[in-house]
């Protein structure tokens, strides 16, 4: 949309008055000048690094703030949203329309009388299922982040652009009335699905803008029978599509970035009647301990137009990727075309035939790979077990076990069974097989090597795992291969990694109990109750 008068009027309608200037869909060149210009202070300021990318800091907000997330409860949402409750704790806390109105006025006041950046883009590479997103901010690098992460419209598309959702980023304002309103803190990330607006206040973390729209896709798509997934995806030379589910830090980005396959996307996808499509126009990769040797594609993507968050920049402008003193959750966003080996011109492909669940097991119990039955697929998808890894959320620094429904509970707007149903339906139609891959720890106390995990993924994708002789892991009743090409055979049965196998047994019984306890919350649903037998035997 290039009619700025119309845009100003639409912003006025949202309460943003006396707008000094609109910098509309700025080019990368313009953003670079804006975010590095002399005189910028605090978190507005970008620092040029020797890699060519600009680095910014987000202060104490080095991860998402799930405790500050709210959805307005109204006629649209009261019976559809998976609301937080004692029985099922989640991040979808209801907000009254009165509180929403006061927050909207607060953010509008913050953005009024300012020079504003407005970036318009799409969430979703499927023309049928995408949503048009308009991002409004007073901070240049936030506009840069959005330009990197959302799908950049063509000039033709911009002429007829329709904003289905508007994000008002008021990172510089906080809510003084939070206590009286019964909120968690002065910071807020709030959604009004009826109005099509997201408000951000207090937090500077870039990921709030990206994950906010993911939560909205997770609301709209399953209601239309389209799978909405927290996964990465790639496609082989023969058009075979694989999707990788997993929470942050389990290897979604690393393992789907594969020189032998084209990347569809690294984090958020839909799966409709035509196939798998990316929601995003960029990647948001973790950079802690990043090296050119281990992750050449991601390292090579960190150049001009990439945006680094919370990394340590030395006095000479070089980046110390091993320094986690600000946060373990250091990040980089870059447009997807910074990776050479991607699906072009549109990030979408056919139906998936391999579905991989990545988990980082902090207990050292689960095998590096197991093949799942259809019932186990649904059970482990609903369980979404992993270990939360350091620093992806504020206040989490040590690996702790967690169960996150559908490998993305933080972003689910509907009940988990709705996502499981749509996924299983899509898998049945395409004849897809599912595998559970543990990228975490084993009895040696060490993390399973990337080399071995890559060997496992190769065996899944090239079909050699189907030819392997299989054994069974007790308690979990998982089918595990006895040997795979290029993988250390000593790690395939986790019991073999313990000096004393009885130790594995004790830990396995403990973990099995946790699975059973966690799954109780689903058993009120008759469909989910049938899956109990597919889980471990405590």
From Swiss-Prot:
Domain of life: Bacteria
Cofactor annotation comment: Binds 1 Mn(2+) ion per subunit.
First-level EC class: lyase
Positions of Mn(2+) binding: 211, 230, 267
Keyword Cell cycle: no
Keyword ATP-binding (UniProt): yes
Binding locations of substrate: 64, 205, 211, 331
UniProt-recorded Gene Ontology molecular function terms: ATP binding; metal ion binding; phosphoenolpyruvate carboxykinase (ATP) activity
Catalysed reaction, written as an equation: oxaloacetate + ATP = phosphoenolpyruvate + ADP + CO2
Record SUPFAM superfamilies: PEP carboxykinase N-terminal domain, PEP carboxykinase-like
Sequence positions that bind ATP: 152, 211, 230, 246-254, 295, 331, 344, 447-448, 453
Cofactor needs: Mn(2+)
EC numbers, comma separated: 4.1.1.49
Annotated GO biological process: gluconeogenesis
Pfam families hit by this protein: PEPCK_ATP (PF01293)
Localization annotation: Cytoplasm
Pathway: Carbohydrate biosynthesis; gluconeogenesis
Subunit details: Monomer.
NCBIfam families (UniProt xref): pckA, PRK09344.1-1, PRK09344.1-2, PRK09344.1-3
Family: Belongs to the phosphoenolpyruvate carboxykinase (ATP) family.
Annotated function: Involved in gluconeogenesis. Catalyzes the conversion of oxaloacetate (OAA) to phosphoenolpyruvate (PEP) through direct phosphoryl transfer between the nucleoside triphosphate and OAA.
Annotated protein name in UniProt: Phosphoenolpyruvate carboxykinase (ATP)
Native species: Actinobacillus succinogenes (strain ATCC 55618 / DSM 22257 / CCUG 43843 / 130Z)
């Amino acid at each position: 949309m290039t009619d700025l008068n119309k845009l100003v009027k639409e912003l006025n309608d949202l309460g943003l008055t006396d707008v000094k200037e609109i910098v509309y869909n700025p080019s990368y060149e313009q953003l670079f000048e804006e975010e590095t210009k002399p005189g910028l202070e605090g978190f507005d300021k970008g620092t040029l690094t020797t890699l060519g990318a600009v680095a910014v800091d987000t202060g104490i907000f080095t991860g998402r703030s799930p405790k500050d997330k709210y959805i307005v409860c109204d006629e649209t949402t009261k019976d559809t949203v998976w609301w937080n409750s004692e029985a099922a704790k989640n991040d979808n806390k209801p907000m009254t329309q009165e509180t929403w109105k006061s927050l909207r006025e607060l953010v509008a006041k913050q953005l009024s009388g300012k020079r504003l950046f407005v970036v318009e883009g799409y969430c979703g590479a499927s023309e049928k299922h995408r949503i048009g997103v308009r991002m409004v901010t007073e901070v240049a690098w936030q506009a840069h982040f959005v330009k990197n992460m959302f799908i950049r419209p063509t000039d033709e598309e911009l002429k007829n652009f329709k904003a289905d959702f508007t994000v008002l980023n008021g990172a510089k304002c906080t809510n003084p009335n939070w206590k009286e309103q019964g909120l968690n803190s002065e910071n807020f990330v709030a959604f009004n699905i009826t109005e099509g607006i997201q408000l951000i206040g207090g937090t500077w973390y870039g990921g709030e803008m990206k994950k906010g729209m993911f939560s909205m896709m997770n609301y709209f798509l399953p209601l239309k029978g389209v799978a909405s997934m927290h996964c990465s995806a790639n496609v082989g030379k023969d058009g075979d599509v694989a999707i990788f589910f997993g929470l942050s830090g389990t290897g979604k980005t690393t393992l789907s970035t594969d020189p032998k396959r084209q990347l569809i996307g690294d984090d958020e996808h839909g799966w409709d009647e035509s196939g798998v499509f990316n929601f995003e126009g960029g990647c948001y990769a973790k950079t802690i301990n990043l090296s050119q040797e281990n992750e050449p594609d991601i390292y090579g993507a960190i150049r001009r137009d990439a945006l680094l968050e919370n990394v340590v920049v030395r006095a000479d402008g070089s980046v110390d990727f091993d320094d986690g003193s600000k946060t373990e959750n250091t990040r980089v966003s870059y447009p997807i075309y910074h990776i050479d080996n991607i699906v072009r011109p549109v990030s979408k492909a056919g139906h998936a035939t391999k579905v991989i669940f990545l988990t980082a097991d902090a207990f050292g119990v689960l095998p590096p790979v197991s093949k799942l039955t259809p019932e186990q697929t649904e059970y482990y998808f609903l369980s979404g077990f992993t270990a939360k890894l350091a620093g992806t959320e504020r206040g989490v620094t040590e690996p702790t076990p967690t169960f996150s429904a559908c490998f993305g509970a933080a972003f689910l707007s509907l009940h988990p069974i709705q996502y499981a149903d749509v996924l299983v339906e899509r898998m049945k139609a395409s004849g897809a097989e599912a595998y559970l891959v543990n990228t975490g720890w084993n009895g040696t106390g060490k993390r399973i090597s990337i080399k071995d995990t890559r060997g496992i993924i190769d065996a899944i994708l090239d079909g050699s795992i189907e030819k392997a002789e299989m054994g069974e892991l007790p308690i979990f009743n998982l089918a595990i291969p006895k040997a795979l090409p290029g993988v250390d055979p000593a790690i395939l049965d986790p019991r073999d990694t313990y000096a004393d196998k009885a130790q594995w047994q004790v830990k396995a019984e403990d973990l099995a109990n946790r699975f059973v306890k966690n799954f109780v919350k689903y058993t009120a649903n008759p469909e989910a109750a049938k899956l109990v037998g597919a889980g471990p035997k405590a």
